[in-house]
Structures are given as C-alpha cells and as structure tokens.
Amino acid sequence: MASVGECPAPVPVKDKKLLEVKLGELPSWILMRDFSPSGIFGAFQRGYYRYYNKYINVKKGSISGITMVLACYVLFSYSFSYKHLKHERLRKYH
C-alpha cells in the first residue's frame, strides 16, 4: 500500500478505460483491444448490459430509456435514407 505522501502505482494503458486514456496513448490503446468476433461481441454485450442497468432496470423507471432507443432508431434510419429523400425533394413532378 502507498503511504500518505506517495502516488499510487500507474495503471497500464491496456487496463484503462477509453475516457481515462490520454491522446498520446490512444493509438497504443486501440492496438491492444480485442478485435476478434468474440471480443467485439463481448464489447457490445457489456454496452447493452450497462445501458439496460442504467436506464431500463431501475427502481423508479420512466419512459426515457425506451425513448432514447427510439430516437436513435429514427436518426439512424433518416441518415441511411437521406440520399433517397434528397433526390425526391429535388424532383419537380412526383
């Protein structure tokens, strides 16, 4: 254990979270990530459980968690269909 005046031991770059990584350490941090299919699946699974426990699985729940999912769906679907919608808007006769 560190005494009162000493700094704690530095955390290795691999064990840091994304928000704790400095800009100079970012390329090495990205290269240390697991990009295998199981690693990517695990990252999505951790994100899902984190979102679910923060917004859906709460004592006093509200509609905010589901509303965020629906808002993201609407924004992504609009961004994917924007190219098609833009061409329809520029037509003179429909």
Swiss-Prot record:
Broad class of where this protein is predominantly found: mitochondrion
Sequence positions bearing N-acetylalanine: 2
Keyword Membrane set for record: yes
InterPro entries found in the cross-reference section: F1F0-ATPsyn_F_prd
Keywords recorded for this protein, A-Z: Acetylation, ATP synthesis, CF(0), Hydrogen ion transport, Ion transport, Membrane, Mitochondrion, Mitochondrion inner membrane, Phosphoprotein, Transmembrane, Transmembrane helix, Transport
Keyword Transport in annotation: yes
GO biological process: proton motive force-driven ATP synthesis; proton motive force-driven mitochondrial ATP synthesis; proton transmembrane transport
One Pfam family hit: WRW
Cellular component aspect of the GO annotation: mitochondrial inner membrane; mitochondrion; nuclear membrane; proton-transporting ATP synthase complex
Membrane-crossing residue ranges in chain numbering: 68-85
N6-acetyllysine found at: 22
Cellular compartment(s): Mitochondrion; Mitochondrion inner membrane
Membrane topology: Single-pass membrane protein
Modified residues (Phosphoserine): 3
Subunit organization: Component of the ATP synthase complex composed at least of ATP5F1A/subunit alpha, ATP5F1B/subunit beta, ATP5MC1/subunit c (homooctomer), MT-ATP6/subunit a, MT-ATP8/subunit 8, ATP5ME/subunit e, ATP5MF/subunit f, ATP5MG/subunit g, ATP5MK/subunit k, ATP5MJ/subunit j, ATP5F1C/subunit gamma, ATP5F1D/subunit delta, ATP5F1E/subunit epsilon, ATP5PF/subunit F6, ATP5PB/subunit b, ATP5PD/subunit d, ATP5PO/subunit OSCP.
Function: Subunit f, of the mitochondrial membrane ATP synthase complex (F(1)F(0) ATP synthase or Complex V) that produces ATP from ADP in the presence of a proton gradient across the membrane which is generated by electron transport complexes of the respiratory chain. ATP synthase complex consist of a soluble F(1) head domain - the catalytic core - and a membrane F(1) domain - the membrane proton channel. These two domains are linked by a central stalk rotating inside the F(1) region and a stationary peripheral stalk.
Family: Belongs to the ATPase F chain family.
PANTHER family listed in its UniProt record: ATP SYNTHASE F CHAIN, MITOCHONDRIAL-RELATED, ATP SYNTHASE SUBUNIT F, MITOCHONDRIAL
Record-given protein name: ATP synthase F(0) complex subunit f, mitochondrial
Provenance organism: Homo sapiens
